[in-house]
From Swiss-Prot:
Organism: Rattus norvegicus (Rat)
Compartment annotation: Mitochondrion inner membrane
Keywords, alphabetical: Acetylation, Membrane, Mitochondrion, Mitochondrion inner membrane, Phosphoprotein, Transferase, Transit peptide
Role according to the record: Transamidinase that catalyzes the transfer of the amidino group of L-arginine onto the amino moiety of acceptor metabolites such as glycine, beta-alanine, gamma-aminobutyric acid (GABA) and taurine yielding the corresponding guanidine derivatives. Catalyzes the rate-limiting step of creatine biosynthesis, namely the transfer of the amidino group from L-arginine to glycine to generate guanidinoacetate, which is then methylated by GAMT to form creatine. Provides creatine as a source for ATP generation in tissues with high energy demands, in particular skeletal muscle, heart and brain.
The protein, known as: Glycine amidinotransferase, mitochondrial
Description of how the protein assembles with itself and partners: Homodimer.
């Protein structure tokens, strides 16, 4: 990624001239060189004013509103999503590959319409209660702007309606003092970032770094139109080969396919995150952070945090139904691998966009406090045995929209420093 500031002067500016010139070709190298020289001269003549400007507009790191390096440091500020105006996505190939067959008639009938009104009302109430409890626990809560997701839109490559702003974890990732907007992979989520822009602009004005990953065209070439939807066996074989409904046509990823542990960040190739997307993130975060690809026995991977949820330094929840192929990496580092109990959510409860394993999709308020579903008594007891106090909140109707506490939130600021847990 090229930054404008690389041409302001100094050795980095000179390196940028050489690089940009080589990429553009000899005919434009002279123009780049002249631009660099004039910029360098202007920078030298106004060095004092630039220094004063930098001091005025760039707060010290301790003043930055965005700062989070892992999933468990003491939580100070969080973004919580909205269920209001949530719409059923059109039943396209990428949606079909990420949903259970028993719900396909629901999508075929309701695609482009609002989710059932009564259910949304209950979900809204649950999330409001979650926000109230977070506030009582001393956490600052931010909410995305309300948007009507039923509006149709069209790009040169596709047309769609929207989905929701319920799951900030899917679209936003905080790494240190930087907030990264993920490009997403569902066409119904193309404009989801708009709900968060007022929040992110405020963070930016107050000193946070703000990066938007390359936006995919989401043209037909991004999706395998012949992906074997019905055959679980075929999907297992393809998953083992690293092949999913999204192709490598262009980078795409959801932020929820990454999970942080200080300098080490773990990512999975999934139905919505491709290798190009992971590679973009790896290059962008290097050399301060190391991005590792891990995989699971899962024919339908989408988002890592209901499969592999890191809840403390050296402590991870690992889904017994989707074992991690690289689990020895964590065992050799001395980590404790905890297998969560089977969820107790009833079979007849609608889970239009997820599995029952949202029970392990928990939010850590710090190493000794966890927000957990009030109905999931077995996992509450598991946490208590680990010496972790549970903050019980009913979120079952909100689960139906595809996420648990971790999905419904994006931790913006945690009180802690960057550390390595694998050296």
């Amino acid at each position: 990624m090229l930054r404008v500031r690389c041409l302001r002067g100094g050795s980095r500016g000179a390196e940028a001239v050489h690089y940009i010139g080589s990429r553009l070709g000899g005919s434009l190298t002279g123009w780049v060189q002249r631009t660099f020289q004039s910029t360098q001269a202007a920078t030298a003549s106004s060095q004092n004013s630039c220094a004063a400007e930098d001091k005025a507009t760039h707060p010290l790191p301790k003043d930055c509103p965005v700062s989070s390096y892992n999933e468990w440091d003491p939580l100070e500020e969080v973004i919580v999503g909205r269920a209001e105006n949530a719409c059923v996505p059109p039943f396209t190939v990428e949606v079909k590959a990420n949903t259970y067959e028993k719900y396909w008639p629901f999508y075929q009938k309701n695609g482009g319409l609002y989710f059932p009104k009564d259910h949304l009302k209950k979900a809204v109430a649950e999330v409001e209660e979650m926000c109230n409890i977070l506030s009582m626990e001393g956490v600052t809560v931010k909410r995305p702007d309300p948007i009507d997701w039923s509006l149709k839109y069209k790009t040169p490559d596709f047309e769609s309606t929207g989905l929701y702003s319920a799951m900030p974890r899917d679209i936003l990732m905080v790494v240190g003092n930087e907030i990264i907007e993920a490009p997403m992979a569902w066409r119904s989520r193309f404009f989801e970032y708009r709900a968060y822009r007022s929040i992110i602009k405020d963070y930016f004005h107050r000193g946070a770094k703000w990066t938007t990953a390359p936006k995919p065209t989401m043209a037909d070439e991004l999706y395998d139109q012949d992906y074997p939807i019905h055959s679980v066996e075929d999907r297992h074989k393809l998953a083992a080969q690293g092949k999913f409904v999204t192709t490598e046509f262009e980078p795409c990823f959801d932020a929820a396919d990454f999970i942080r542990a200080g300098r080490d960040i773990f990512a999975q190739r999934s139905q919505v995150t491709n290798y190009l997307g992971i590679e973009w993130m790896r290059r962008h975060l290097a050399p301060d952070y190391r991005v590792h690809i891990i995989s699971f026995k899962d024919p339908n991977p989408m988002h890592i945090d209901a499969t592999f949820n890191i809840i403390g330094p050296g402590l991870v929840l690992s889904n017994p139904d989707r074992p991690c192929h690289q689990i020895d990496l964590f065992k050799k580092a001395g980590w404790t691998i905890v297998t969560p109990p089977t969820p107790v959510i009833p079979d007849d409860h609608p889970l239009w966009m997820s599995s029952k394993w949202l029970s392990m999709n928990v939010l850590m308020l710090d190493e000794k406090r966890v927000m957990v579903d009030a109905n999931e008594v077995p996992i509450q007891k598991m946490f208590e045995k680990l010496g972790i106090s549970t903050i019980k909140v009913n979120i079952r109707n909100a689960n139906s929209l595809g996420g648990g506490f971790h999905c419904w939130t994006c931790d913006v600021r945690r009180r802690g420093t960057l550390q390595s847990y694998f050296d």
